[in-house]
Every structure is written in structure tokens, then in C-alpha cells.
Amino acid sequence: MATRPSWLSPEALHNIIGLWHGESATVQPLGSSTNHLLFGFSATGRRLVLRLSLAGYRDPAHVEEEFAWVRYLGENGILACQPLQSRNGCWVETIDHPVDGACVAVVTRESRGVPLVLSDEYLFGPLAPGTNPQDAPVFREWGRTSARMHKLAAGFSSATGFQRNLLDGPALSDLAARVLPAAESPVAETLRQCWDEIQRLPVDSESYGVIHGDFTAANLFVNDGQIEIFDFDNCCQGWFIYDISITIYATLMALSQRADYRGEAEFFISRFMNGYRSERQLDAFWLSAVPLFLRFFNTLAYVAASQQSDSEAGVVRSFAAANLGADAPAFDLNFSGLYSFHGGYDGT
């Protein structure tokens, strides 16, 4: 997790939120990610969120692109936590420091929704006694929102042409080779092979464009039955099936210790895909690419978890290790069949 820099005193934080007319007495730390610090605060009667990106992590121009995309989505009916301009008229502010370098500050409004991971339907409210297992409206809405974003990508352009690209596969493979023990060198090779296959996929406006890049439950709210999106830090140019596959992978991992893993996995995928299909069609070629992306994400997860020691990393590593082979049991699902599936949940 990101470490708060020594220069970020209460006074310095006051000066930063002051760019958005923030009230110092209302500031609350909201946590951190690998490269960001998050703070909530009030300004002119609204709750807002400051995202402070640490020096060297993102080019400010790329952050400008990120939030141009967020604004574009909002202008076209997608619920996304919208940025606010500073009193200088800027969407993105650069905070210079003579020793630690420049940090990048962005402020968005705070969602009024409920985090998806805390909603009644997530894993798996619809299966509670007295509910209709056919419904799963949040899963369908999740898929529908994904498809709507992908449809909108075709019409989006930024002043710089959106320069942020997908992960650097060769660099990740080299990292895996460096950090894993020699006995696990096949893992790095699997990562390289998956990336090489991914790079051979077609690139056109029907399959490739700006994607969220981390469209998982952890980055979504439920707001009056609609999906509201935040954390666009991983948005980039990529394949739309990448977005779909990361959603599926993260949910499969969340289900990995459930008694009826397969039944609930199929339930989720079929409902998510049902929602996606209501807005945008996928052909069999792209559905057949889902297992490739799942293997890629799984290998990445294994490498990342091998560098951590907390209990959550242990769960991730266990799931990833069990599915490193080409015959990964967790991914042995009929994605084409689930895409067109209309039936109910058969689990108990």
C-alpha cells in the first residue's frame, strides 16, 4: 500500500483540498492502494473524494485522459463518480515537491450508492429463501453497464488520442522470471506465452478501444439498482473481452471457496452475459478467448501473491496455484453456452 509522504502534513493536505474549497475539519483518510492515497472531505455541502497519486506513478497527461473518459461516460448516461474542477479551472492538479517530486491530485464526488461487495445480491443474495433465483438484477445490470461502456468507446476521442495502453506483457514476464524461484520458471514462461497469444488477437473498433481495465465488484457501487463505477486508474486501450474476462476472473476467485463453486460460477456468468447481450453482441471467436485471458490473469495473480504474506494473498495464491495448468479446473466452463443461457440456477 502507498505510504503517506513525510511532506503531506495536515497543513499541506489543507492546501490541496483548498483547491476544491475543502473544509479541513471534515477530512477523513479513506485508505490507500499501491500508488494512491484517498481522503474524503466536505466542500460547499457535498462529500468529495481526493485521490492523490504518488510521484512518478502517472503522467499528469494520462490522468487528464482518464478523467476525460469518465466525463464522457457521464455525459452519455453511465453512472460514474464524476471529477470536479479545482478553483483554478483544472480537472487535474499537479502538486510539486522539491525532494519527492510531483504528486497528481484529482477530486471526485462521493457515491451515494452501496459498495457492490456489500449489496444483498453479491455472492449470492438472490439464492436466499423466498427469493427468485432467476432475477439477479444486479448481475445483469453489471453486464449491461460493461456493454454500454464498450459501445461508447467507439465514439470517444481525447486531445492526445488516449495514449495509455494495456499492461506491458514482456516486462511482467521478466519480473516473474526475476522474483520466482528457479523451480517455478515455467510460470514466467506461461505468462509470456499467454501475452504472445493475446497480442495476436485482432484489433479493430468492434473489439478494441478504451476499457475500464479493472471492472470488478471492488470498484462498483449499486445506486438505486444501477451500477455506479469508480476507480478508473487502470483504464487503457485494450480488448473489450479483457474487461469482461477480468470481471469473470475476479468473481471466480471470490467464489473459489464456496461449496457449489461451479453452480454459482455458472449462475453469475450467465446473468452477467445476459445483461451484456441485451446491449451488445459478442461472437463465438471472442467468447473462445475468455480462457486465454483467465490463464493470463491467473498467472499474474500467482506472481503478485508470491510477493505478499497476508492471509488474502494466501487465498489468491492457493486459487492461482490450483489453476496454473492448461487444464485449469476453475476455468473449465462453457462460456459460449453460458453467454446464450436463459435457464435457472440448479444448485442447492
Locate the predicted segments by residue.
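Conserved NTP-binding catalytic cores of kinases and kinase-like/nucleotidyltransferase enzymes
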Residues: 1-91, 98, 224-226, 340-348
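Active-site catalytic-loop/activation-segment of kinase and kinase-like phosphoryl-transfer enzymes
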Residues: 2, 161-201
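ATP/Mg2+ or Mg2+-diphosphate-binding catalytic cores
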Residues: 301-348
